Regions:
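Radical SAM enzyme core and accessory elements
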Residues: 1-8, 59-68, 158, 434-518
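Catalytic cores of alpha/beta
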Residues: 112-116, 371-386
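N-terminal [4Fe-4S]-dependent radical SAM core
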Residues: 7, 14, 156-218
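Conserved SAM/AdoMet-binding glycine-rich loop
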Residues: 2-9, 13-16, 69, 100, ...
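Flexible glycine/acidic-rich beta-alpha junction loops that bind and position SAM and/or redox cofactors
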Residues: 16-17, 224, 237, 279, ...
Length: 518
């Protein structure tokens, strides 16, 4: 079979903004399955090309490529405008090309996009790894009329009417696909040198140190119902018709990590529920086989103690640890926002890590949660201080607490049902997104679509975040001073029963367990 060329484009935000170079995990699996089915792929990461050479003319690059089918990923809302602009450029070069767009944001606004854009032919919904080769093959040999037979798509028929087909096709076995190999992409080696920027998520910048970074996908779907999250159980139901989560096997994850190590990757980001992939076993195997990378594990719920202890063991040779969204110090508010664990369980995990000289954990909180008030946030501050106090006598200060506004994801339950939440600020509609992204400057935050209720508006939320940061900074300074002075009770008969950190010092309650004066 003669290989047919398919052009894949990762879009910019706008022609002057190259911030978000990172590929969605799903498109890597889609492209690699096309390659497996004998398609030739030319993949260009447009914002990456802009970063590497700001003077490059993207249109001139594309003119040199003979393409009939273009695939554009549009997973995050950041690309809603840019994906359409890139499609327009492709149509200007080859008016007969067929442009396919996929991803959660394109899916969510699929009707708005097709009504307003003349340059996008098909938007694919739900799973597309196995479906895409069949769609591309029929489009190449039969043209757009072939679209009538396929599920999971929306398109305009020859009369200009929008046909929104049902999602009936699923790729539930994600062990069949390759989400690791990105060598199909132009300048993939340079891509691996980029890491998350310090200003905001997604704003990428070249790291000065030589630590190649990779986000490792291990799960598709979610079994949690966090109301503000765009990747929740609700989100997958409305956008992919998925009712169950798909997980990658431990064997395949270990193989993936071996491949990444061979590519020179030093740092992995993993996001999911560790018990679903048996991560305790995975880390044991990695350690036995001396496969050591720095792992940041973003745990969607709370890791099991066995996994925490195994991470501590693995971290003897690496800088590996956890990020956990504790969200609130109030347990009822935490549960309302999709996290089903209590304060005492958080403290148990924190104490295990605190007693070790390895690993770390960062707990993330937010003031503007569903159902939360300023009173609840005072509980959050108190609980965050209790966690941070563990650093006073720890072998090393490896407990951290972070704060930030809870953003409303585009594809979340809150966004789709905003009238039920008495929001004090309107959510952004499609037109607002397009107008905002069209002129968004490079290097700045995406925006502030924070959850804003009658209890905590955006201005109050931002101020509460600043108050939290100042309180925690003062605590950290006091802890650092205390640790530097090393004023620990050295006698084995003395036991610290209580620690209280105030603005002017660290106060200890010490129990003398002996009958003698010490």
């Amino acid at each position: 079979m003669t290989k047919q060329t398919i052009l894949h484009l990762h879009p910019f935000c706008n022609k002057d903004n190259s911030d978000f170079i990172f590929l969605p995990a799903g498109i890597v699996g889609v492209i690699n399955n096309l390659r497996k089915n004998y398609f030739k792929i030319i993949s260009i990461n447009v914002p990456l090309e802009m970063k590497l050479n700001p003077n490059k003319n993207i249109k001139e690059i594309l003119k040199k490529i003979n393409f009939k089918i273009v695939i554009i990923d549009c997973h995050w809302y950041y690309f809603l405008y840019g994906a359409q602009e890139i499609a327009k450029i492709c149509k200007e070069i080859n008016s007969e090309c067929i442009v396919i767009v996929g991803g959660f944001s394109a899916n969510f606004f699929r009707k708005e996009i097709l009504k307003t854009s003349k340059n996008i032919d098909v938007i694919i919904k739900g799973d597309s790894e196995s479906l895409m080769p069949d769609i591309c093959k029929d489009l190449i040999y039969k043209g757009k009329n072939a679209l009538t037979k396929f599920p999971n798509i929306i398109y305009k028929n020859r009369f200009g009417f929008i046909k929104d087909k049902k999602i009936t096709y699923f790729d539930n076995n994600i062990n069949k696909f390759d989400y690791i190999d990105i060598t199909f992409m132009r300048h993939w080696k340079e891509y691996l040198q980029f890491s998350q920027g310090v200003k905001a998520p997604g704003i990428s910048q070249i790291k000065k140190e030589n630590e190649k970074f990779f986000y490792l996908p291990t799960q598709k779907g979610c079994q949690n119902s966090c109301p503000s999250c765009g990747g929740s159980k609700y989100s997958y139901k409305i956008l992919s018709n998925k009712k169950e989560i798909s997980v990658r096997s431990p064997t395949n994850i270990i193989k993936d990590i071996k491949k990444l190590k061979d590519l020179g990757i030093k740092k992995l980001m993993i996001s999911g529920e560790s018990n679903l992939n048996k991560w305790t076993y995975i880390l044991k195997e990695l350690k036995i086989n001396k496969i050591f990378l720095n792992i940041i594990f973003e745990e969607w719920q709370l890791p099991k103690k066995e996994f925490v202890k195994q991470m501590i063991s693995y971290a003897k040779n690496t800088d590996s640890g956890f990020i956990i969204s504790a969200l609130s110090g109030n347990e009822i508010i935490r549960i309302k926002n999709g996290k089903h664990f209590k304060n005492n369980k958080i403290l148990e995990i924190a104490k295990i890590i605190s007693k070790s000289e390895n690993s770390y954990v960062s707990f993330w909180f937010a003031p503007n949660l569903v159902g939360a008030t300023t009173k609840h946030f005072q509980e959050t501050i108190s609980f965050a201080k209790e966690l941070l106090e563990l650093n006073v006598l720890a072998p090393k200060p490896n407990i951290d607490v972070l704060i930030g506004p809870m953003e409303i994801d585009l594809t979340s339950y809150v966004y789709s049902n905003f009238s039920s939440f008495s929001l004090s600020e309107p959510v952004w509609n499609y037109k607002y997104f397009i107008d905002f992204l069209k002129t968004k400057p490079e290097g700045e935050k995406l925006g502030n679509m924070s959850f804003s209720s009658k209890h905590i508006n955006i201005k109050q939320c931002n101020q509460l975040c600043e108050d939290f940061k100042n309180i925690i900074l003062t605590m950290k300074e006091n802890i650092e001073y205390f640790r530097g002075k090393k004023v620990y009770p050295l006698d084995k008969n003395l036991e610290i029963k209580d620690i209280e950190i105030k603005n002017y010092g660290v106060f200890l309650t010490i129990l003398n367990k002996s009958n003698k004066n010490i």
